[in-house]
C-alpha cells in the first residue's frame, strides 16, 4: 500500500513536470485594435503599439496614441501612406526605442514570447506600389499561423505562415520593434 502511494505520487509529479515543461501552443498578446482611416495602416499600427505599451505600464494613453492625429502628422500623399522612417521617428519622439530589422519566424516568436508586438510591412498580392502595415500579435507554430491586428480588417486575423512570408518577403521582411525607453532614459 505504501509503495502504491509513492508510485502514484511519482506519477503525478512526472505528469506535472511534463505538462509544465510544454510550451504553449499559441503565443499571443492582447494588443488593442485600431481600425485604420483611408490609407492609414501605418498610423493605426503605431497607435496600437503605443496603446499596448500604455496598458502594460498602467498609464493613460497619451495624445500620441491617436491614429487620426498620427495620420495628419505623418501622411505623405505621394507615398499613399507613411514612410517607415517616419514611423520610427514618431516612436522616438514619444520616448520609445526603435529597432528595424529583417525579421524571420524565429525572431517573431522570440519577441512575442517576451511580450513585444511587432509591426511588419507586407506587400499583399495585387498591390502595385503601396505597402501595408500590420501588427504581429501572435504565432501558432503547430498550425503555422500568425495572428495579426490588421488595421484594414480586424483584430486577431489568422494568416497562414506561407502567405504571410510571401507578402513579407516582398518588403525584405521589414519589421519594426518599438519598446518604451526605460525610466530616466532619454
Predicted regions and their residues:
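Active-site-adjacent structural segments surrounding the nucleophilic cysteine of cysteine proteases
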Residues: 2-4, 15-79, 124-127, 142, ...
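Sec-dependent N-terminal signal peptides
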Residues: 6-12
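A generic structural signal for short, solvent-exposed coil/turn residues
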Residues: 13-18, 90, 112, 128, ...
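Extracytoplasmic glycan-interaction modules
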Residues: 22, 73, 84-85, 94
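Sec/Tat-exported extracytoplasmic proteins
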Residues: 45, 49-57, 74, 78, ...
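Active-site-adjacent substructure of cysteine-protease-like catalytic cores
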Residues: 97, 101-149, 185
